[in-house]
Regions:
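Sec-dependent signal peptide cleavage junction
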Residues: 22-36
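Extracellular/luminal ectodomains and secreted, surface-exposed scaffolds of diverse proteins
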Residues: 415-435, 514, 519-530
């Protein structure tokens, strides 16, 4: 995973459901427990190993970077202090993605740069010293050169084997808490989502070759845990079935399966109107991990979710609205753990700041940390909008308590002023009602935007924060510019943009991804609250026809504004139209 990961969109938009043709079999001892079914079966040793890795973290965009060194993709040089802090944050395992391509010499030896190997070993040792389980792999090599296996097998396979021969030799005496992953997100063409049966043959050959090389390299590699991916690390049924067959064939009690998950694609990138964590997004989670459990875990093959996150994060972590993002991670973490699958957060530097060693979004971390042990309560929204000039009304919000009890509501995050139940708010079942008098006091400043934060605390799990926002209808203005730098002046008046629709005069969808009128946030358009404008990005105009395009901007308050642009080559003009 890295900044180009959104090229996989077609994979996530249509998950294939097939009926497994495999008969139940256990190759690694007793089946692992499934907490959701109340099973209390004894775990195999390798399942216990994987369970002890929970939770995990990825050192992304560092050794997998394809520049001159580990800093070439913008992250600082890895320090021992960083690794120690990851352990202190509660993580039990670390995945260190590594791209070897430009660190290897020519054939037939394909010698790896000794200085680079030494540096990788140094960070691996720091991680082991910090008490972490460690996973290393071949990372972007998968799409740089390994994907050519079909047409260039005689070069790809020896190079792959040479890489693992050298890696296995270097680490053969390291602790068993170090594991090897054969290849990251393997694919065998230039795109994603291929179902060509020959690709399964190629992956089976790579995994089998990897297994043989490591096992024959001696030392602790004779029984070191090895991690094998599905095709593209995707959890479609056929891909799980194919990996199952490979693992059965290898007949080795120290094998682990791995998949990746970045959510239901429309929600993950904020497209097609999927702005909230709704039932279809939730069902994608349950379907995915039910398949992984039924096909692998229930048959004694442990599974590591080697990467997870949201694809919109590649643009910025605000692509998905904060509360909706938190609900996604709360439920995902809960469900993956319920299926006895270990999860490893993908972090390319956008989550844990590697310079100041602090979380960029503390709420995100606090919710994840709480979810490692229990469920957290959430709400239907974290946004409470009060429209300026209108009479303030009582506001009701449905809570998703997840078995918890509300213990108090406080003004701001320091929990200084506590609201009084009955006077300031009421709770009836799962419905929280904030009194009009309370909201009126909180927005008395008359200033647009965030006026207060209300922190709801519960007997267990993380807090839930509501933003109390004073707003008015946003105002847009006429604009003129070019397709590579067009922006609409906008007075947001405290409101926040949720999504944008685009259609031609005949009603057909305009711009990229024209199967939907709702465009992708951060790809086709983006708001700038600092410069007070909505930018229509070059990606949008690259796939928009000349002529009139009618836009509709949807805001989180419920406000909807119409706007019309006219494109003539590279020239673009825009004007407000009536709602």
């Amino acid at each position: 995973m890295s900044f180009w990961h959104n090229t996989k969109s077609i994979v996530f938009i249509a998950t294939v459901l097939l009926i497994s043709l495999l008969s139940p079999a256990s190759i690694l001892g007793a089946s692992a427990k499934n907490p959701s079914e109340g099973n209390k079966l004894k775990e195999s040793k390798i399942q216990s190993y994987v369970s002890d890795m929970q939770p995990g973290w990825n050192l992304g965009n560092t050794f997998d970077a394809m520049g001159e060194d580990e800093t070439s993709w913008g992250n600082p040089r890895v320090t021992k202090e960083l690794i120690q802090q990851i352990s202190k944050q509660g993580y039990k395992s670390i995945r260190i993605p590594i791209t070897w391509d430009h660190r290897m010499g020519d054939g037939p030896d394909y010698k790896i740069d000794p200085a680079f190997m030494d540096r990788v070993e140094e960070v691996v040792n720091w991680s082991l010293d910090a008490g972490l389980y460690v996973m290393i792999n071949l990372h972007h090599d998968s799409w740089i050169w390994v994907h050519q296996m079909g047409e260039n097998r005689d070069e790809v396979l020896p190079r792959y084997q040479a890489a693992w021969t050298q890696i296995a030799h270097t680490f053969k005496d390291h602790s068993h808490k170090l594991m090897f992953e054969s290849i990251n997100e393997p694919r065998f063409n230039s795109g994603w989502g291929s179902e060509d049966q020959t690709h399964y043959v190629h992956l089976d050959e790579l995994n089998t070759s990897f297994h043989k090389i490591v096992r024959e390299s001696g030392g602790k590699n004779t029984d070191r845990p090895l991690v094998l991916p599905t095709l593209e690390t995707n959890a479609a049924q056929e891909r799980l079935d194919e990996l199952y067959q490979t693992i059965v064939k290898l007949d080795d009690p120290n094998l682990i399966a791995t998949i990746h998950y970045y959510g239901f694609w429309p929600f993950s990138v904020n497209i097609a109107g999927f702005t909230t964590f709704e039932e279809q997004t939730k069902k994608d989670i349950t379907d995915t991990f039910d398949r992984a459990y039924d096909t692998l875990v229930s048959k004694g093959i442990p599974v590591i979710l080697g990467e997870y996150g949201l694809l919109g994060f590649d643009k910025n972590t605000g692509t998905i609205e904060q509360g909706e993002k938190l609900k996604f991670f709360e439920f995902l973490t809960h469900y993956v753990q319920e299926k006895n699958i270990t999860h490893m957060l993908w972090d390319n530097g956008q989550h844990f700041n590697r310079t100041n060693l602090k979380w960029n979004d503390q709420d995100f971390y606090e919710l994840m940390r709480a979810s490692w042990k229990t469920r957290s309560a959430t709400a239907e929204s974290d946004l409470i909008f009060i429209k300026k000039g209108e009479k303030v009304q009582d506001t009701s919000i449905n809570l998703e308590l997840n078995g918890n009890k509300l213990t108090g509501i406080f003004v701001n995050r320091n929990k200084g002023d506590k609201l009084h139940k009955g006077k300031d708010y009421t709770l009836s079942g799962n419905t929280l009602t904030l009194k009009a008098s309370t909201l009126e006091k909180l927005t008395a400043s008359g200033q647009y935007g965030d006026n207060a934060e209300l922190t709801a605390s519960f007997n267990k799990g993380a807090d839930w924060t509501f933003d109390v926002i004073l707003h008015d209808t946003p105002k847009l203005e006429s604009a003129a510019g070019s397709a590579d730098s067009f922006a609409i002046p906008a007075a947001f008046n405290g409101d926040r943009l949720a999504t944008m629709e685009a259609v031609y005069s005949d009603g057909t969808n305009a711009g990229p991804q024209n199967w939907t009128s709702y465009k992708e946030f951060g790809y086709a358009f983006t708001p700038s609250y600092q410069s007070n404008e909505i930018k229509l990005l070059e990606n949008f105009f690259n796939e928009a026809n000349d002529g009139i395009v009618n836009l509709k901007f949807h805001f989180w308050s419920g406000e909807v504004l119409n706007y019309q642009i006219t494109k003539n080559g590279n020239e673009v003009t825009g004007k407000v139209t009536s709602n």
